[in-house]
Amino acid sequence: MLYIKSSNIGDIMKKILLILALMSSAFVAAQERPFQAFFGIKTENPLAVVSALDSFSNANCPGTSSVRLMQELFNGPEETTHTIIVTFPNKMSYLMWANNWTNCPAAGKFLNTMNEISEQTYQFMGMPLMGDGDPNADQVFQVFLMDVKDPASYAKAYSNLMSSGEQCAGSWALVAMGPGMNVERYGTHFAYCGFKDIDVYLDGYMSNVTPTKEYTDFIKKVSNIRELKAVNMSGVVKDWAPQQ
């Protein structure tokens, strides 16, 4: 994960808005393609974070993106306690969100509140490259952070692995990190596997004693082009969808 100790969520979210505005032209050819912004935070008051997101969502401005709050259940030595994921279904959704952000009083209130109750630990934009299943149906996720030297070859090998249908009980995806990524510490890509609930996750974890042939073949193919940085586990706290 991308760790920025001296920054807070208000300042960083303002900066990433500018970065994304400058980068938006890169999505002209793929304007119907979804992408996401990830904001990691450290907080001792998660209920206040939920309340702040409730208030912001109820204002429905700009109202063009969905928001998910994740709790980091196991993430090693990282200080991040939660991750805010903002999903844009297409480029126009983001442009409307960015253009309306400065005119939305609730946005300013949200940033001020978050400054008081949390500290931002990382931020980056992510572009899903492939995936399957409905992540909205999953509540627990295992996340693999990695540095990929040959993205095309890795994507092909990963697609073949996941198409076997035996590697993930729920949704899955491979995501390329964009603006904000820290390659040296956290790599260039992450993949996730979703589970309906913690019970399903534990069943899979406890029964995964012997790797499948497909997984063994996959490891052989990517051993020289992928460096695994970390394996984290996170759970959904709450989702907020745009109001119609």
Residue spans for each PLM region:
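Sec-dependent N-terminal signal peptides
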Residues: 16-25
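Compositionally biased regions
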Residues: 7-8, 25-26, 224
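Intrinsically disordered, low-complexity segments enriched in glycine/proline and serine/threonine
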Residues: 8, 17-18, 94
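Short, Lys/Arg-enriched N-terminal segments with co-localized hydrophobic residues
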Residues: 1-12
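Intrinsically disordered, low-complexity segments
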Residues: 4-5, 22-23, 232
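Short S/T/G/P-rich N-terminal loop/turn motif that feeds into the first structured element of a domain
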Residues: 30-244
